[in-house]
Amino acid sequence: MEIKEITIIGGYDKNGNPEPVREVTIKRGEIVGVVGPTGSGKSNLISDIEQLAQGDTISKRRILVNGEVPPIEMRRDPKKRRIAQLSQNMNFLADMTVEEFILMHAKSRGVYRENIVDEVIELANRLTGEPIKKDYNLTILSGGQSRSLMVADVAVISDSPIVLIDEIENAGIKKHEALELLAGYGKIVLVITHDPVLALMTDRRIVMRNGGMQKIIETTEEEKEISRKINEVDNWLLSLREKIRFGERLTHEDISLMVKG
């Protein structure tokens, strides 16, 4: 079943009141943010989507696929759900090389494209300041390297059309580029975030409050331009962190580079 869009049918907030947002449809290639204070229900919304809820969760929301109730086997079998999740706390535990992991995952997904390993690693290295090599063992990858590899792997190999991202702002990767990469591969992307770089580069953001979808804000071109400028600062800070990590000194020249930019 090709998933072209999902629709969230509103349920109830923590007080049992109907959610102000009664329906929202998200199509492939769209990036939608989920914002709100701690305890506002962001993770529950993502969980409802991951479960393809049908009024059977605490929120009573329903999730439609292509405008229809998803088949029961899609709900019961995680493999048929085809939903990928990424979080800042995910790490690899398998004792194998990066190349072995990519080839194994590609084989399991029926992807036999030539140079698939190089393609995934090249994309991953666009997102991290620490280059990844195919002979690196997964267990020695840093947090930023792990998340970069996961994003590239989901984009290139995974056939999951829906990607749910839970607060990757502290994951040590180029966040702006990561979201653009996933959307460019035609994924439906929902991202929980407090980060202005991520929130402002989404097409829309769902504002959560008291367990309910309070409103939807369409991102303006002005906000997207602000996001690009903040992202430049963010990438500059990432480069400074990498210099510190590798034992290099910082100079006034490092500051002047940002000022000139």
UniProtKB/Swiss-Prot annotation:
Q: Which UniProt keywords apply?
A: ATP-binding, Nucleotide-binding, Transport
Q: Name one GO molecular function term.
A: ATP hydrolysis activity
Q: Which family does it belong to?
A: Belongs to the ABC transporter superfamily.
Which PROSITE patterns does the record match to this protein? ABC_TRANSPORTER_2
Q: Does the keyword ATP-binding apply?
A: yes
Stored Pfam families:
ABC_tran (PF00005)
**InterPro entries, alphabetically?**
AAA+_ATPase, ABC_transporter-like_ATP-bd, P-loop_NTPase
* Protein name per its UniProtKB record: Uncharacterized ABC transporter ATP-binding protein MJ0121
Where does the chain bind ATP? 36-43
Name the species this protein comes from: Methanocaldococcus jannaschii (strain ATCC 43067 / DSM 2661 / JAL-1 / JCM 10045 / NBRC 100440) (Methanococcus jannaschii)
| ABC transporter domain: residues covered | 1-236
Q: Which residues cross the membrane?
A: none
